[in-house]
Amino acid sequence: MHNQAPIQRRKSTRIYVGNVPIGDGAPIAVQSMTNTRTTDVEATVNQIKALERVGADIVRVSVPTMDAAEAFKLIKQQVNVPLVADIHFDYRIALKVAEYGVDCLRINPGNIGNEERIRMVVDCARDKNIPIRIGVNAGSLEKDLQEKYGEPTPQALLESAMRHVDHLDRLNFDQFKVSVKASDVFLAVESYRLLAKQIDQPLHLGITEAGGARSGAVKSAIGLGLLLSEGIGDTLRVSLAADPVEEIKVGFDILKSLRIRSRGINFIACPTCSRQEFDVIGTVNALEQRLEDIITPMDVSIIGCVVNGPGEALVSTLGVTGGNKKSGLYEDGVRKDRLDNNDMIDQLEARIRAKASQLDEARRIDVQQVEK
């Protein structure tokens, strides 16, 4: 694998969302948002637990009503992952969920109310040591900024964000992160670039309302990838009109591709052609589903023929190179065995699980030695 220098991240202050550190060099946190009715406690808890299983660091929950706030109390008691309450329009809901142990408040300054209401929310957050996310969105800019700029622009999003950053500064509150989201990739990227030069608080990245599973993943990969490659961003959400679990998977895939943070298996697979000696696509799809529980970072190359297979296998944790009836299995760049093409999936799953256990044990021993 090419020896790329690590991305130099923007310096920022640190806050904590529950027990998850955000900013100041902490691992970039991946989060999602529930799409159940919050008042359906069972469904919401089940979805949050599903997000936890695929690695969500933080989960946001919409709390649109006081009934939802009461449901939030019950939800919080049944999950372990830190929860962010998404609050719009009614500041009193923010005060209520703060009583119930919320880990972070997300407010949209364009619709939460006047300065006095914001002050009440901030005072409550300070008293209970709850961080705030200032969530600026191109679709809900303040009316005066809409009139001033005519349309959402990077300068408009920046002015909205700075207006409320300044407000929190005047209230001597510094436990916050900021987002300036837009559905347009260029608008979002430039807004974040401008904001990154103005403040040193952590930045939450996102391309809002990005689209369905395919188009939304592409937009997010481009927008977030550009910013992350420049060292901008401390936490992220991939917004998809899809199962929230997919948001977490895509988020980790983006970080994995940039070598910022790895979780689970990085599959390297050829797009296939008539040279393939076994069903590459079927093998990859099956293994991705079967091995979702593996969190050990490792590269697995699955190549259908000998044209590129050996080269990819040399730089993979495990690699398969297609051959006639049997395919070569490489481990850490060394050819170890041959696998029957008719039983490829089961054999490879077993080898990957064994390798993951081996790597986990080696890391455990390393940690013990360091602690001594």
Swiss-Prot record:
GO molecular function: 4 iron, 4 sulfur cluster binding; 4-hydroxy-3-methylbut-2-en-1-yl diphosphate synthase activity (ferredoxin); 4-hydroxy-3-methylbut-2-enyl-diphosphate synthase activity (flavodoxin); iron ion binding; metal ion binding
BP terms from Gene Ontology: isopentenyl diphosphate biosynthetic process, methylerythritol 4-phosphate pathway; terpenoid biosynthetic process
Pathway named in the protein's UniProt entry: Isoprenoid biosynthesis; isopentenyl diphosphate biosynthesis via DXP pathway; isopentenyl diphosphate from 1-deoxy-D-xylulose 5-phosphate: step 5/6
Keyword vocabulary terms for this entry: 4Fe-4S, Iron, Iron-sulfur, Isoprene biosynthesis, Metal-binding, Oxidoreductase
Functional pH dependence: Optimum pH is 9.
GO cellular component terms, semicolon-separated: cytosol
Any single Pfam family the record assigns to this protein: GcpE
Effect listed in the UniProt record for changing residue 322 to D: Loss of activity
Known EC number: 1.17.7.3
Coiled-coil regions listed in the entry: none
Record bears the keyword Lipid metabolism: no
Binding-site positions, [4Fe-4S] cluster: 270, 273, 305, 312
The record's free-text note on cofactor binding: Binds 1 [4Fe-4S] cluster.
Cofactor(s) for this UniProt protein: [4Fe-4S] cluster
Enzyme class: oxidoreductase
Similarity comment: family membership: Belongs to the IspG family.
Role played: Converts 2C-methyl-D-erythritol 2,4-cyclodiphosphate (ME-2,4cPP) into 1-hydroxy-2-methyl-2-(E)-butenyl 4-diphosphate, using flavodoxin as the reducing agent.
Protein's UniProt name: 4-hydroxy-3-methylbut-2-en-1-yl diphosphate synthase (flavodoxin)
Species whose genome carries this gene: Escherichia coli (strain K12)
